């Protein structure tokens, strides 16, 4: 270690200041090549989840997942199957759309010594049948789950934390319908009991809600950005193209 680096480390330690580490930089959507350094295509478990969209995307197919100019674009289009297939995931809805989902290669695990800040700017559809989200979910089992952004076919963003399937805290915040970009942030910090995680949610720099994840400390989480359709957002969904954009996304831990 260079002497000056050692001196800074000692100073930070004496002062009780923890260094910040960038997990996902704000330029991860600057190009496909950079995107592929930090993100994977589809869900961690495959192409299907609990809505009416089947995810499509790969290093050779960017018709539904694209990255450029620090912006991720997810696109959902109706399918034309006379007899639609069904999702392989519960509750096995009929597939009416092809769409896009990505998840971060780095998992997020809050510990007593590692808190996380997740930030991004979102242009989200709010029409009935559109179900975009920006969320954390357990790598093993379920819950934990925390939804930083979830739009379920209404002009609201839902901040959610699932402690069980029935013990859920939700805070709804009004969301504009003009597809303008607005920022969302979540700060995840371990509580002093060493088991629970405090989650502070903000929109456009204003604190909106504080929720608590029971037993979330030490649990590895996937970070997912998806454009799901119908399901909890109502039906029928749009008959044309739906676009969901995320820009300047950054994840840090201290």
Where do the language-model regions lie?
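Short tryptophan-centered beta-strand motifs in secreted/extracellular beta-sheet-rich domains
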Residues: 29, 118-120, 180-192, 199-201
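Flexible glycan-contacting loops in extracellular carbohydrate-active proteins
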Residues: 212-244
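Beta-strand acidic-aromatic groove motif in beta-rich domains, primarily in extracellular
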Residues: 128-136, 195-198
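Low-complexity, Ser/Thr/Pro/Gly-rich disordered linker/stalk regions
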Residues: 18-128, 139-143, 148-154, 160, ...
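Beta-strand-rich interaction surfaces with strong enrichment in secreted/lumenal proteins
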Residues: 100-110, 134, 169-176, 213, ...
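Fungal secretory targeting signals
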Residues: 1-20
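Short, aromatic/His-centered strand-loop micro-motif at the edge of beta-sheets
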Residues: 162-183
């Amino acid at each position: 270690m260079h002497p000056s680096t050692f001196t800074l480390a000692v100073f930070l330690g004496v002062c009780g200041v923890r260094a910040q580490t960038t997990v996902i930089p704000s330029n991860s959507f600057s190009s496909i090549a950079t995107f592929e350094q930090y993100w994977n295509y589809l869900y961690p478990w495959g192409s299907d989840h609990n809505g009416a969209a089947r995810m499509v995307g790969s290093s050779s197919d960017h018709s539904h997942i694209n990255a450029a100019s620090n912006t991720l674009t997810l696109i959902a289009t109706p399918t034309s199957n006379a007899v639609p297939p069904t999702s392989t995931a519960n509750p096995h809805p009929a597939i009416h759309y092809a769409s896009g989902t990505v998840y971060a290669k780095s998992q997020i695990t809050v510990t007593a010594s590692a808190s996380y800040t997740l930030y991004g700017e979102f242009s989200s559809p709010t029409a009935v049948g559109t179900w975009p989200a920006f969320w954390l979910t357990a790598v093993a089992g379920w819950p934990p789950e925390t939804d930083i952004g979830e739009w379920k076919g209404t002009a609201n963003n839902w901040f959610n934390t699932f402690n069980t399937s029935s013990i859920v805290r939700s805070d709804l915040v009004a969301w504009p319908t003009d597809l303008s970009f607005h920022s969302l942030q979540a700060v995840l910090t371990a509580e002093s009991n060493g088991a629970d995680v405090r989650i502070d949610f903000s929109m456009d720099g204003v604190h909106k809600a504080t929720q608590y994840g029971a037993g979330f400390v030490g649990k590895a989480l996937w970070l997912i950005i998806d454009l799901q359709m119908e399901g909890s957002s109502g039906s029928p969904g749009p008959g044309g193209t739906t676009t969901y954009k995320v820009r300047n996304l950054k994840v840090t831990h201290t």
